[in-house]
């Protein structure tokens, strides 16, 4: 674990090999380690459980439909049609259903963190 600016940076590995880099002040991904083939197509969304391997994730679907079904602690992956090279990750609160605590944007090919939206 590495400490930067008062928070710890670590990595956890889910069964099956998917890994998530996280900050100790919450499961805010600081790098996205989701295989590109498991990302939703541009214009689509996918509910993602950070503790599950890629092959055990729910299928992608319509963003309007999926946005209302994200369980606490899960993420909603979004690929905007006008930003094909980006993945938006909405991180949902682990205790409060429907509450998004952060939206982070990543490069779809490298998984590199790009920006945080407010």
Please provide the spans of the model-predicted regions:
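Peripheral, non-catalytic segments of secretory and membrane proteins
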Residues: 3-118
């Amino acid at each position: 674990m590495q400490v930067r600016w008062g928070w710890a940076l670590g990595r956890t590995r889910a069964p099956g090999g998917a890994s998530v880099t996280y900050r100790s002040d919450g499961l805010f991904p600081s790098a996205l380690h989701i295989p590109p083939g498991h990302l939703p197509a541009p214009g689509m969304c996918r509910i993602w459980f950070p503790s599950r391997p890629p092959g055990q994730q729910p299928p992608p679907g319509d963003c309007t439909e999926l946005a209302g079904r994200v369980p606490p602690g899960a993420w909603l992956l979004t690929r905007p049609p006008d930003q094909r090279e980006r993945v938006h990750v909405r991180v949902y609160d682990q205790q409060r259903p429907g509450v998004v605590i952060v939206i982070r944007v990543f490069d779809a090919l490298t998984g590199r963190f790009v920006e945080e939206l407010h």
